[in-house]
Protein backbone atom coordinates (compact mmCIF):
# COMPACT_ATOMS: atom_id res chain seq x y z
CA UNK A 1 0.00 0.00 0.00
CA UNK A 2 1.03 3.60 -0.55
CA UNK A 3 3.21 4.83 2.28
CA UNK A 4 5.14 1.59 2.66
CA UNK A 5 8.61 0.78 1.40
CA UNK A 6 9.13 0.63 -2.37
CA UNK A 7 5.68 2.02 -3.20
CA UNK A 8 5.52 4.97 -5.53
CA UNK A 9 3.27 7.93 -6.24
CA UNK A 10 3.48 9.35 -9.75
CA UNK A 11 1.86 12.69 -10.58
CA UNK A 12 1.16 13.67 -14.20
CA UNK A 13 0.11 17.13 -15.37
CA UNK A 14 -2.08 17.13 -18.47
CA UNK A 15 -4.27 19.48 -20.50
CA UNK A 16 -7.48 17.50 -20.07
CA UNK A 17 -8.97 14.46 -18.38
CA UNK A 18 -12.10 13.00 -19.92
CA UNK A 19 -14.25 10.56 -18.00
CA UNK A 20 -15.00 7.93 -20.63
CA UNK A 21 -18.13 6.75 -18.82
CA UNK A 22 -20.15 9.95 -18.86
CA UNK A 23 -18.00 12.07 -21.23
CA UNK A 24 -17.37 14.77 -18.62
CA UNK A 25 -14.16 16.72 -18.23
CA UNK A 26 -12.56 16.19 -14.83
CA UNK A 27 -10.04 18.32 -12.91
CA UNK A 28 -8.08 15.16 -12.14
CA UNK A 29 -8.25 11.50 -11.25
CA UNK A 30 -6.33 8.93 -9.28
CA UNK A 31 -5.80 5.25 -9.83
CA UNK A 32 -3.65 2.33 -8.84
CA UNK A 33 -1.58 0.07 -11.06
CA UNK A 34 -0.17 -2.90 -9.22
CA UNK A 35 1.38 -1.42 -6.06
CA UNK A 36 1.89 2.13 -7.31
CA UNK A 37 -0.46 5.10 -7.05
CA UNK A 38 -0.99 7.59 -9.87
CA UNK A 39 -2.56 11.03 -9.91
CA UNK A 40 -3.38 12.80 -13.17
CA UNK A 41 -4.15 16.51 -12.87
CA UNK A 42 -5.39 19.11 -15.33
CA UNK A 43 -3.21 22.22 -15.29
CA UNK A 44 -5.09 25.38 -14.37
CA UNK A 45 -6.56 27.39 -11.53
CA UNK A 46 -7.78 24.38 -9.55
CA UNK A 47 -4.52 22.41 -9.76
CA UNK A 48 -3.55 22.65 -6.09
CA UNK A 49 -7.03 21.86 -4.76
CA UNK A 50 -7.39 19.01 -7.22
CA UNK A 51 -4.02 17.59 -6.14
CA UNK A 52 -5.09 17.53 -2.48
CA UNK A 53 -8.44 16.01 -3.41
CA UNK A 54 -6.92 13.20 -5.45
CA UNK A 55 -4.18 12.65 -2.87
CA UNK A 56 -6.86 12.13 -0.24
CA UNK A 57 -8.30 9.28 -2.31
CA UNK A 58 -4.85 7.67 -2.35
CA UNK A 59 -4.43 8.27 1.40
CA UNK A 60 -7.90 6.79 2.01
CA UNK A 61 -6.70 3.49 0.58
CA UNK A 62 -3.92 3.37 3.16
CA UNK A 63 -6.10 4.52 6.07
CA UNK A 64 -8.90 2.08 5.29
CA UNK A 65 -6.41 -0.75 4.76
CA UNK A 66 -4.60 -0.25 8.06
CA UNK A 67 -7.14 1.21 10.50
CA UNK A 68 -10.86 1.05 11.25
CA UNK A 69 -11.20 4.75 12.04
CA UNK A 70 -13.39 5.49 8.98
CA UNK A 71 -15.74 2.53 9.54
CA UNK A 72 -18.36 4.77 11.17
CA UNK A 73 -17.67 7.92 9.14
CA UNK A 74 -21.35 8.38 8.21
CA UNK A 75 -22.18 8.53 11.93
CA UNK A 76 -20.30 11.85 12.11
CA UNK A 77 -23.23 13.43 10.27
CA UNK A 78 -26.22 14.52 12.39
CA UNK A 79 -29.09 12.03 12.68
CA UNK A 80 -31.14 11.83 9.50
CA UNK A 81 -28.39 13.23 7.24
CA UNK A 82 -27.17 10.58 4.82
CA UNK A 83 -24.92 10.45 1.77
CA UNK A 84 -26.72 10.30 -1.57
CA UNK A 85 -24.39 7.52 -2.85
CA UNK A 86 -24.42 8.99 -6.33
CA UNK A 87 -22.58 11.84 -8.00
CA UNK A 88 -25.52 13.50 -9.68
CA UNK A 89 -28.48 14.64 -7.62
CA UNK A 90 -30.92 17.52 -7.55
CA UNK A 91 -30.57 20.69 -5.51
CA UNK A 92 -33.85 19.84 -3.79
CA UNK A 93 -31.95 17.13 -1.92
CA UNK A 94 -29.82 19.73 -0.15
CA UNK A 95 -30.41 22.44 2.42
CA UNK A 96 -28.26 25.59 2.17
CA UNK A 97 -27.58 25.61 5.93
CA UNK A 98 -25.68 22.32 5.51
CA UNK A 99 -22.97 24.23 3.64
CA UNK A 100 -22.36 27.32 5.79
CA UNK A 101 -21.73 28.73 9.22
CA UNK A 102 -22.14 26.97 12.54
CA UNK A 103 -24.55 24.45 11.02
CA UNK A 104 -22.17 23.35 8.24
CA UNK A 105 -22.20 19.59 7.71
CA UNK A 106 -20.52 19.42 4.30
CA UNK A 107 -18.06 21.55 2.33
CA UNK A 108 -20.42 21.58 -0.67
CA UNK A 109 -23.11 19.43 -2.35
CA UNK A 110 -20.44 17.24 -4.02
CA UNK A 111 -19.18 16.16 -0.60
CA UNK A 112 -22.64 14.74 0.13
CA UNK A 113 -22.25 12.10 -2.57
CA UNK A 114 -20.08 9.51 -0.81
CA UNK A 115 -18.03 9.39 2.42
CA UNK A 116 -14.81 9.22 0.36
CA UNK A 117 -15.74 12.45 -1.47
CA UNK A 118 -16.60 14.09 1.85
CA UNK A 119 -13.14 13.24 3.17
CA UNK A 120 -11.46 14.36 -0.06
CA UNK A 121 -13.24 17.73 0.01
CA UNK A 122 -12.31 18.14 3.69
CA UNK A 123 -8.62 17.47 3.04
CA UNK A 124 -8.70 19.65 -0.06
CA UNK A 125 -9.95 22.65 1.93
CA UNK A 126 -7.95 21.85 5.08
CA UNK A 127 -4.70 22.10 3.11
CA UNK A 128 -5.48 25.52 1.63
CA UNK A 129 -5.11 28.90 3.38
CA UNK A 130 -8.09 31.03 4.35
CA UNK A 131 -10.61 28.26 5.00
CA UNK A 132 -11.07 28.41 8.77
CA UNK A 133 -14.78 29.24 8.38
CA UNK A 134 -15.26 25.88 6.62
CA UNK A 135 -14.32 24.12 9.85
CA UNK A 136 -16.12 26.28 12.43
CA UNK A 137 -19.03 23.90 13.05
CA UNK A 138 -18.96 21.04 15.53
CA UNK A 139 -19.68 18.49 12.78
CA UNK A 140 -16.84 19.73 10.57
CA UNK A 141 -14.45 19.71 13.54
CA UNK A 142 -15.38 16.07 14.25
CA UNK A 143 -14.88 15.11 10.62
CA UNK A 144 -11.56 16.96 10.36
CA UNK A 145 -10.33 15.42 13.63
CA UNK A 146 -11.27 11.93 12.45
CA UNK A 147 -9.57 12.49 9.07
CA UNK A 148 -6.42 13.75 10.80
CA UNK A 149 -6.42 10.86 13.30
CA UNK A 150 -6.81 8.41 10.42
CA UNK A 151 -3.79 9.83 8.60
CA UNK A 152 -1.72 9.84 11.80
CA UNK A 153 -2.64 6.22 12.58
CA UNK A 154 -2.11 4.92 9.05
CA UNK A 155 1.27 6.58 8.62
CA UNK A 156 2.50 6.19 12.23
CA UNK A 157 2.69 9.93 12.84
CA UNK A 158 2.68 9.92 16.62
CA UNK A 159 4.85 13.00 17.09
CA UNK A 160 3.71 16.40 18.36
CA UNK A 161 4.17 18.10 15.00
CA UNK A 162 1.11 19.94 13.69
CA UNK A 163 0.77 19.06 10.02
CA UNK A 164 -0.71 21.35 7.37
CA UNK A 165 -3.98 19.38 7.18
CA UNK A 166 -4.43 19.97 10.94
CA UNK A 167 -4.22 23.77 10.73
CA UNK A 168 -7.97 24.26 11.28
CA UNK A 169 -8.39 21.83 14.17
CA UNK A 170 -9.66 23.59 17.25
CA UNK A 171 -8.10 21.93 20.26
CA UNK A 172 -9.69 22.41 23.68
CA UNK A 173 -7.75 24.32 26.32
CA UNK A 174 -6.00 22.02 28.79
Labelled PLM ranges:
Residues 10-174:
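Active-site-flanking segments in enzyme catalytic domains
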Amino acid sequence: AFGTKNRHLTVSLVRDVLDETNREHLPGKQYWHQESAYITLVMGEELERSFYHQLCHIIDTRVMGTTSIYDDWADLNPDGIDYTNRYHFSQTETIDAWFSGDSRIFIDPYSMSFPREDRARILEYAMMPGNSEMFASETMQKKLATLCDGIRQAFDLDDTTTYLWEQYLITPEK
